[in-house]
Amino acid sequence: LLLKAIFKYHQRINSDGFYFDGTASTSQKITIEGGDLLVLRDDLIMIGYSERTTARGIDTLMRAIAEKGGVQNFIVVEIPKSRATIHLDMILTMVDRDSCVIFPPLVTGLHKCRAFHVHYEQKQVKRIVEYPGVLEALRTQGLDLKPVACGGDDELRQEREQWSSGANFFALAPGHILGFEHNQATAEELAKNGFEIVTADQVISEEHKLKPGQATLVTMSGSELSRGGGGCRCMTMPLNRNAVNW
């Protein structure tokens, strides 16, 4: 209710309201959490079907967005209903226009999650197409992403660092991301893929300034935060975003 009042009445927040108002719903079967919602482009949204976001919640949200006319294409990813994969952003987050950090077993491995492309026309579902994985589904929408492995090539480190929010990054801008410093194998993998690694203290003190065109991982301490289930993207609510130049 507090957030509802802020977004509705605060003078510094120019909001058109809510696509889905959870305080108005009395159904336990209609639930949505932000970690399952990834805005990939201004015309494409990805949603996780998880233990926290239900099928009815997804249907309600897609319909509400499509009725406003902005987005007609959705990718729905069915992820395991478990504590380790509580949200979609625990197994995949965007880190640049053309790359993402993934948890390999569930995105490219033998147990990769199914994905569905849901297309709306004239505010109605026109077609639903199933794909064997999320990256395959995204390619059909012109988004061919380069995956960077959480935990690197070692399966044990993949499991360990995914548990500690190693695939959960908050993008300050395309190529400028914030993540936990304790996920060292993931940071090493990002470095191999062209990311410069700096600390949050260096950025705050202006010892290091983020440069346009230079992919950069800003690391912060947060072992207790991830231990409690929080990731950098999980705990961030962007209030104002500039448009991305695709």
Regions found by a protein language model. Name each.
Residues L1-W246:
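The feature marks the mature, well-folded catalytic cores of soluble enzymes
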